[in-house]
C-alpha cells in the first residue's frame, strides 16, 4: 500500500504530463495507436471489454494498470527512491523489456531483460545518471535506424531531461 501510494500520488501524475493526460489521442506514426493515460490500446486490448471500455478509462484505473503492468513488472519498488520515477518513466515510454535491459547495463549484469536474484541484488546501486545516458543513446540509435521515428526524438529527449530534472 505504501509503495502504491507513492506511485499514485507522486510518480504517476508526473509521467502523465508527458502522456497527454486523460485525453484520448492517436498520434500518427506511434505504433500504440489510440492512447489514454499513456495506455496504448493496440498493446493492452486484453485488459478491456472493447474500445468503448478503453476510452472511458479513469486516471485511477490507469494508475492501477500502470502500477501492476509497468512499475511492479520492472521491480521499480527495488530501486533507490531517487531513481523510481525515472526508471518507471523509461518503462512507460519504451517498454518494460528495454527499460530492464538498460537498468541491467547500469547494474553491470547480463542485460537479458529478466530480473533474477543477481539483478535484484544490484538494483539498489543504480544511478539515475547512467539510466539517462543509456536511455538517450538508445533513442538516438533508434531514430537513426528507423527514420520514421526521427520525428519523436526531440520529444523523447525533452521528456528524458524533464523527468531526470524533476525532484519529488
Model regions and ranges:
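Cell-wall polysaccharide-cleaving catalytic domain and substrate-binding groove, primarily
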Residues: 1-168
Amino acid at each position: 500500500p505504501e509503495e502504491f501510494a507513492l506511485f499514485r500520488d507522486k510518480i504517476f501524475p508526473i509521467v502523465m504530463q508527458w502522456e497527454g493526460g486523460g485525453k484520448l489521442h492517436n498520434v500518427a506514426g506511434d505504433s500504440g495507436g489510440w492512447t489514454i493515460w499513456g495506455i496504448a490500446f493496440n498493446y493492452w486490448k486484453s485488459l478491456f471489454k472493447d474500445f468503448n471500455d478503453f476510452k472511458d478509462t479513469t486516471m485511477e484505473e490507469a494508475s492501477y494498470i500502470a502500477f501492476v503492468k509497468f512499475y511492479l513488472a520492472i521491480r521499480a519498488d527495488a530501486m533507490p527512491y531517487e531513481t523510481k520515477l525515472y526508471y518507471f518513466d523509461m518503462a512507460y515510454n519504451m517498454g518494460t523489456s528495454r527499460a530492464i535491459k538498460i537498468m541491467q547495463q547500469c547494474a553491470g549484469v547480463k542485460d537479458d531483460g529478466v530480473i533474477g536474484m543477481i539483478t535484484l541484488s544490484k538494483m539498489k546501486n543504480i544511478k539515475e545518471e547512467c539510466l539517462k545516458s543509456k536511455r538517450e543513446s538508445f533513442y538516438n540509435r533508434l531514430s537513426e535506424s528507423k527514420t520514421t521515428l526521427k520525428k519523436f526524438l526531440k520529444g523523447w529527449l525533452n521528456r528524458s531531461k524533464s523527468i531526470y530534472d524533476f525532484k519529488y
